[in-house]
Swiss-Prot record:
Pathway: Cofactor biosynthesis; thiamine diphosphate biosynthesis. The lineage of its organism: Bacteria, Bacillati, Bacillota, Clostridia, Eubacteriales. Keywords: 4Fe-4S, Iron, Iron-sulfur, Lyase, Metal-binding, S-adenosyl-L-methionine, Thiamine biosynthesis, Zinc. It comes from the Bacteria. It catalyses: 5-amino-1-(5-phospho-beta-D-ribosyl)imidazole + S-adenosyl-L-methionine = 4-amino-2-methyl-5-(phosphooxymethyl)pyrimidine + CO + 5'-deoxyadenosine + formate + L-methionine + 3 H(+). One of its GO terms (biological process) is thiamine biosynthetic process. It is an enzyme of class 4 (lyase). PANTHER family: PHOSPHOMETHYLPYRIMIDINE SYNTHASE, CHLOROPLASTIC (PTHR30557:SF1), THIAMINE BIOSYNTHESIS PROTEIN THIC (PTHR30557). This is Phosphomethylpyrimidine synthase. Its EC number is 4.1.99.17.
Amino acid sequence: MTQMLAARAGEITTAMKRVAEKEGLSPEFIRQGVAEGSIVIPANINHRNLDPVGFGKGLKTKVNANIGTSTSFTDIEKELEKLKVVLEAGADAVMDLSTGGEIDQGRRRIIEESTIAVGTVPIYQSFLENRNKRGSMIAMTADDLFEVVERHCSDGVDFITVHCGITLEVLERIKKQSRITDIVSRGGSFLTGWMLHHGKENPLYEQFDRLLDICLKYDVTLSLGDGLRPGCLADATDRAQIQELIILGELVDKAREKGVQAMVEGPGHVPLDQIRANIEVQKTLCKGAPFYVLGPLVTDVAPGYDHITAAIGGTVAAAAGADFLCYVTPAEHLGLPTLEDVREGIMASRIAAHAADIVKGIPGALEWDKKMARARKALDWDEQIKLAIDPQRAAKIRQERNPDGHEACTMCGDFCAMKIVAQYLGKEPESC
């Protein structure tokens, strides 16, 4: 029985209790959210060491980190090092987007070592296996694709990105439009090439019930991918993007009817003033399904700093109702991220998520900031570092810039505003 079916039957599962504990909410609140589909708990029955987390309405905004090999860098050990960074940096989920090396072996090791939800994009592996075995990615059959989907699910993957909303009708609209970047989704581009070459409908759409049966078997959450997400600001919120979203909303209904949990993925590159509208349209068309956004990036001109452009957009998106942020690293649009890139990307997205949670009124969000303010007022450096979203970085900078442990920071020194004002207000801060 899936989490959704259990919730509808009135059962509060162990996973629901754990999510409630983490969120500081009642188990009944979580059960109701899962039952109606506004909350998902990705928790494959075969992911044995998972510490479940919930995404959705009324919960803290969550952060995903992407790792995985490429055709140029196939070392799974390096990706497992990234997984350690992902866990240490506090991400809530990780996606293995591997496209090189021993993909099955790497995925299984990531699942084995990950205590957070693991997601994948099965179509990557299906196309690559066909290229290697038959000499062409477009030699893939629908059976090939669903075999890989089941392989991922049976291994213990908690959620899968599937680009079900790209249909032949939608592609006709793309042809008529004047997009600058056309299709930037890797899975979306693979499917588009296959569909146009064969003149056939998207098997993930055409055989959606088959997909649901696999997810039902392992309690895998669907992450309905936005294969037509905008790849630049100029392409944002166009007809093709919205048409795909309409289809995804219809598929959310079908998944819920079957008892399969579903969330929806979103853009992408979006001008700041269009972000709220994108969230509101998704929440309406998809009937409150959790929204998982990539960024959104609010400008196209900042390669090397796209973790910042994504954090800006992610804050606005989450404050408007997005539930789950996919991190973007400084290496976005440039290359495979390093360990430090992964850490920076997670921290940028976590900052965005927390800033939005304050606006959302999430329990405990503002209190965290109040605790930091009190620690700063008291010049309590140990407490400030303890409360920092990245204590490791805060401690490092403090030690490097103030090795002698002076009470004030080296920015203000004897002219510390906290000390001066406290002196005249009769509220002398305690020495750290």
